Amino acid sequence: MTTTVSRTAAIAAFLIAQVTFACAAEIKVYATIGVKHSLEDLSAKFENTSGHKVAITWGTGAALAKRILAGEQADLLVLTRQGLDTLSKEGKVAPGSERNFASSTLAVGIKKGAPKPDISTPEAFKAAMLNAKSVAYPDPAGGGLSGVYFAQLAEKMGFAEQLKSKARFPADNFAGKLVASGEAEFAIQQKPELISIEGVEILGSLPADINVTTVFSAGVSKDAKEGGPSIELLKYLESPEAAAVFKRDGLDPPPAAAKAS
């Protein structure tokens, strides 16, 4: 009797596994590097519980939006609010699928154990930048919000000219790596992007008066081939489990006033 029950259970488990495998999909995700550490973790957990596979193409929100507009196909778009808005206006996002799931501000990263200058006020931050030997940040030419904003801020605060000889642009857009390797004294980027780099610690966020909040959003592509599974992943990104991972990695909840459809 026990043997029969065991065999029946084994057969049932096998059949369930076959059905799950047959229904499993590969979700093609285009995602901003601003949430890379969190999304890698969450995607692995989602794969384990759903049976689906998640294939992620990384880039800046602006660069990925351009690729979609140029005709590339994805199922789920995980971008900055600005990037998703650009695609939504061009009819590239499924109506009603957009969700804001996290936000972040700019921070300053230093190598662990390095001196910690004061950056608590705009004046102190400017002084730190002027005294720095080198500053790493994403190349503004790449269109990433961190690099574009910091370049504009330097111009506005009057240290753009001095910054030119100190600027270090990371090839992969992760400014913290140049600090960790000793190639730069400071790194300016989204807080979660700095936290994800081993050997880097957060000196502090930019003063509130000169900082900017970036909202991270997701939406199902209008041309999605795996719409149902994409919605499953989208809902998972709004779950309490996902919120805990985002918080762990230095992300904040999205502002209540941020746009979502």
List PLM regions with ranges:
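Bacterial N-terminal signal peptides
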Residues: A9-T20
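Bacterial N-terminal signal peptides that target proteins for export
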Residues: M1-I11
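Exported/periplasmic ABC-transporter solute-binding proteins
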Residues: C23-A62, K66-A70, V78-G91, P95-S104, ...
